[in-house]
Each structure stands twice: as structure tokens, then as C-alpha cells.
Amino acid sequence: MAAAVPQRAWTVEQLRSEQLPKKDIIKFLQEHGSDSFLAEHKLLGNIKNVAKTANKDHLVTAYNHLFETKRFKGTESISKVSEQVKNVKLNEDKPKETKSEETLDEGPPKYTKSVLKKGDKTNFPKKGDVVHCWYTGTLQDGTVFDTNIQTSAKKKKNAKPLSFKVGVGKVIRGWDEALLTMSKGEKARLEIEPEWAYGKKGQPDAKIPPNAKLTFEVELVDID
């Protein structure tokens, strides 16, 4: 027996309003969308985690798409659902061949940020500001490929943080985007997908392989 077709809960204006939390839209989609629909739109999993990676435009598009395609819960057979979910997973695992230059509808950010030490919550860098950072970069197996943090006392005394203009393409995009969300004094762990790191080519000189997901611990010590 087919499930009852849900009614639209919000108007377009309400969906785009800041008063409507992303979590409410995700909850609605998870309650009413079929598993394969949710998998295609990367909406499966813990609501809090999905809210971290999905932006509002992506959720609004998914909400409208759900009603256009009528792919509600209970409308697909189990075998079809598992096949589609499997296909989506396989496609996600393959390196993307689409043009990385395309900026329209990029979907959720290609990085996640975990705060290790809170900053002052008042001084945030803007595009074009010079930021000063200590950092350590590791591959998924834990290999450190780059750091400016010195361990010996002598080197530590002469060490200087990395300084660059943020948000203007001087560093990988994952850094540019993440640092704009950090406040002075904040230390965070950044897990950056290949698309916002070194992509399909990698960085052979730094021993970074193609399609590598990178992890950085970054401390924003100052902003000019």
C-alpha cells in the first residue's frame, strides 16, 4: 500500500527565509523522501551532520525536486532502492570527470571543520586580509606532508607562521573557504576533499597523490 502523498510544508519565500532552519527542511526530506532520492541528494545520515555540509540552496532545490518527481517514501521497491543507492555510492567513489571550473550549483562545501580551540569569536578575516597561520598537513594514512611547526627549541624561536592573502586563490580552496569562517586565535581540524585540495593531479613534489583527501590542523594566530 502506497504511503500518503505529503503536502508542501512551506512556500518558496519561507524556504529561503533565514527564519527556517536547515535542520527542519532536512527532517522533512528524510521523513518523506525515498532512500534513493535522499542518497542522490546526499541527505542520508544524521540530521546534524547533513546540516553541516548542505547549504540552503541545495536543500531548497532538493525540496522542490521531491515534489516534482514525487519520489516519496514507499513509492519504490526495495530492490530498486538498494540498486540506486549502490549506484550513487559507486559514482561517489569514482573521481569526478566533470569540469571543476563550473561554479553553478556546486552543492555543499568540499570540506569539514572541527574546532579544536575556540578563537575570540569577534575578529574574522575578510577576503584580501593577510592571515598568519601555524599548520600541519597529513594524508589519510597519517603521513605528515607539510608543517611549519618546529619541534626543536632553537628552530621554534626563529619560526614564523605562514602569511598570505586569504580568499583570493593564493592557497587551496579548502583553506581559503575555511579560514574565512575562523576567528583570531582559533585552531581547527580541516578535512578537505580532493576537489578543494589538489584534485586529480595531486602534488607530486609534496608527495600528495591524485584525488587525495587532506587533513590540516590550522591555527589562525593573527589577521592584518
From Swiss-Prot:
Chain segments carrying region Disordered: 89-111
Enzyme class: isomerase
Cellular component terms (Gene Ontology): nucleus
Positions of post-translational Phosphoserine modification: S36, S152
Primary role: FK506- and rapamycin-binding proteins (FKBPs) constitute a family of receptors for the two immunosuppressants which inhibit T-cell proliferation by arresting two distinct cytoplasmic signal transmission pathways. PPIases accelerate the folding of proteins.
InterPro entries: FKBP3, FKBP3_BTHB, PPIase_dom_sf, PPIase_FKBP_dom
Single Gene Ontology MF annotation: FK506 binding
EC nos: 5.2.1.8
Protein name as catalogued: Peptidyl-prolyl cis-trans isomerase FKBP3
Activity regulation field: Inhibited preferentially by rapamycin over FK506.
Residues with PTM N6-acetyllysine: K99, K170
Organism whose genome encodes this protein: Homo sapiens (Human)
Subcellular location: Nucleus
Residues with N-acetylalanine modification: A2
Pfam family, one: BTHB
PPIase FKBP-type domain sequence ranges: 128-224
Keywords in alphabetical order: Acetylation, Isomerase, Nucleus, Phosphoprotein, Rotamase
Main location: nucleus
Residue stretches of biased makeup (Basic and acidic residues): 89-102
Catalytic reactions on record: [protein]-peptidylproline (omega=180) = [protein]-peptidylproline (omega=0)
Family to which the UniProt record says this protein belongs: Belongs to the FKBP-type PPIase family.
